[in-house]
Amino acid sequence: MARTRNRLDRTPFQTAVTDLSHDGRGVARRDGEGGKVTFISGALPGELVRAEPTARSRHFDEAKTVGVLEASPQRVTPRCPHFGVCAGCVLQHLEESQQIVAKQRVLMDNLERIGHVTPQAVLPALTGDNWGYRRKGRFSVRRVEKKDKTLVGFRELDPRFVADLSVCYTVIPQIGEKIPLLAALIEGMDGKRDIPQIEFIAGDDAVALTIRHMQPLSERDRQAWITFAQEHGFAIFLQPGGVDSVQPLWPQEVPLSFRLPQWDVELAFRPLDFIQVNASLNQKMIAHAVALLEAKPDDRVLDLFCGLGNFTLPLARVVREVVGVEGDAGLVARAKENAQRNGLDNAQFYAADLTQDQRSAPWMRQGFDKLLLDPPRSGALEVLQQLPLKTFQRIVYVSCHPGSLARDAGYLVNEQGFTLVSAGAMDMFPHTAHVESIAVFERR
């Protein structure tokens, strides 16, 4: 975003907030500014606030709330002491039931505005655990010389800075309550300036921390990590380089996995693998997707962007055959191992870059009844344009970005003869503005 070069006038102003933006900020049009839009962090629709400008650009301004003069009835006191500074979650001031209402509204607005489509039915919002749900994430680590301390946390609203966290209530408690201990541990290390980030991931029986370090750890620092792991019940992995450089420090064998009891499936994973962040919502989402797909015992299903087999293996318990395709060869290898470990011989997996031409791929010509896809934020348009879509009776699309879903929905409905039967939001990331959603398409 191009910002003006003039010195920013930070004089607070009073304004009425009319809407909530897709990223969770209040929207106002300032009098005396020609109706120019201002996005205000910490403000809610229907409120009268005092706001301090933080940035100006040609088309809109940005500000932060410094006082609430007339509060929305939906405003609540944020649980977290770092709300308003940390960017980890920006909706804690909005009553929980209204957060998902706002996300449904963002989804429908995107479908209509970008895709020019409207679902025949709006699915009830899917919700799971609201606190202590985040089982995977990345903390930034920074040694701040001016403060003479090490900070561990998520980025601040101003992403140049790392939030100095004392606790995080959205992260699983075993990690969220130990952030100050992590910061103190690193502060006492020889290589405290050489650790830029810590990744965390939790299975059902183990929690792992992966330490990215730019220089080899001293023996003293290695032992400090081992002692910390033993005292607090963590597995520690070291990452001196890229993803392939990750190796266990302690213990040497770590049983990282999660179970899906409804499907009698267990999925093993590695410390940097992608898994769904919210365990309780993930189980509901899988059941939701399988039901919406109307999967039947004689069906052959194609599962694109399948990862470890999060949807593929439960589907294998229901249908005749399922084929999973994923761009990450490591995840495909783990998916195959998971299928074998769970005794599922009707699940096949292929590694393929789904943004590239796959029309000659063997899996493309196998013939399927139904399609399930769970693409990254960029969506699935490249592969949708290659698929023999006329062969699919039904498509279930799980999305982590409403904009790309809307674009792809427009393609399916307006160009390929599908009906958008239903769509709805799923609250994978409570208290954040992130919108996870699911949509169902049927051939007309």
Curated annotation (Swiss-Prot):
Reactions listed under catalytic activity: uridine(1939) in 23S rRNA + S-adenosyl-L-methionine = 5-methyluridine(1939) in 23S rRNA + S-adenosyl-L-homocysteine + H(+)
SUPFAM superfamilies the UniProt entry points to: Nucleic acid-binding proteins (SSF50249), S-adenosyl-L-methionine-dependent methyltransferases (SSF53335)
Disulfide feature: none
PROSITE patterns with a match to the protein in the record: SAM_MT_RNA_M5U, TRAM, TRMA_1, TRMA_2
Claim: Transferase is one of the keywords in the record: yes
Annotated binding of [4Fe-4S] cluster, by residue: 80, 86, 89, 168
Active site feature: 400
EC number(s) stated in the UniProt entry for this protein: 2.1.1.190
Purpose of the protein: Catalyzes the formation of 5-methyl-uridine at position 1939 (m5U1939) in 23S rRNA.
PANTHER family per UniProt: 23S RRNA (URACIL(1939)-C(5))-METHYLTRANSFERASE RLMD, RNA M5U METHYLTRANSFERASE
Protein name per Swiss-Prot or TrEMBL: 23S rRNA (uracil(1939)-C(5))-methyltransferase RlmD
Protein species of origin: Xanthomonas axonopodis pv. citri (strain 306)
